[in-house]
């Protein structure tokens, strides 16, 4: 007997996840994107990473046929942008500082990390698709605290001792400032 979907959603909501924008271009060169909390490193040799996308997403046809995609890992102050990219009808690229990389990807300027991939493989996975990418380029910012999503909301990245990472990477008290 399969697990209850509601209970599974509740259980998975308890798993903290980073938040990223995943972007690709359609055949006409128009950028498309979605918000993902399913960005995962798979292998270092060869360098592989994956994202998952619902088959019902408006951008599904683009990602089901693209040859490349990029992942912009969001900072904690990018939550409005994360919500915009999670909606079906939003003009996702209006506002926000998007730039083109040397490889041609559209990425968020100021993301804590950017990972550019060529599609290595696509795997059907129930009502989703797993997009496995071979990492071609990585850029990491030295400053910035990553966005975290847990219990169906954005949360601060803090230790049990009450220290939150600062933009310099050192812990600061959760109630400071």
Curated annotation (Swiss-Prot):
EC number: 1.-.-.-
Class of this enzyme: oxidoreductase
Keywords carried by this UniProt record: Antibiotic biosynthesis, Oxidoreductase
Gene Ontology terms for molecular function: FMN binding; riboflavin reductase (NADPH) activity
Alphabetized Pfam families for the sequence: Flavin_Reduct
Superkingdom per UniProt: Bacteria
One annotated GO biological process: antibiotic biosynthetic process
Annotated metabolic or biological route of this protein: Antibiotic biosynthesis; actinorhodin biosynthesis
Family stated for the protein in its record: To S.pristinaespiralis SnaC.
UniProt protein name: Actinorhodin polyketide dimerase
Species per Swiss-Prot/TrEMBL record: Streptomyces coelicolor (strain ATCC BAA-471 / A3(2) / M145)
Gene field: actVB
């Amino acid at each position: 007997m399969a697990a209850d979907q509601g209970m599974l959603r509740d259980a998975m909501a308890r798993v903290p996840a980073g938040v990223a924008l995943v972007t690709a271009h359609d055949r006409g060169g128009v950028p498309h994107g979605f918000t993902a909390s399913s960005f995962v490193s798979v292998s270092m040799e060869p360098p592989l990473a994956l994202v998952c996308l619902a088959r019902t997403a408006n951008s599904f046809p683009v990602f089901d046929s693209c040859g490349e995609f990029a992942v912009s890992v969001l900072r904690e102050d990018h939550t409005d942008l994360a919500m915009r990219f999670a909606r079906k009808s939003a003009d996702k690229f209006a506002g926000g500082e998007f730039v083109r990389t040397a490889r041609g990807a559209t990425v968020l300027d100021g993301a804590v990390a950017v990972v550019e991939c060529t599609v290595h493989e696509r795997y059907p996975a129930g009502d989703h698709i797993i997009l496995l990418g071979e990492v071609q380029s990585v850029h990491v910012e030295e400053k910035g605290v990553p966005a975290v999503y847990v219990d169906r909301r954005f949360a601060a990245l803090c230790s049990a001792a009450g220290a939150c990472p600062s933009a310099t990477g050192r812990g600061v008290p959760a109630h400071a400032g």
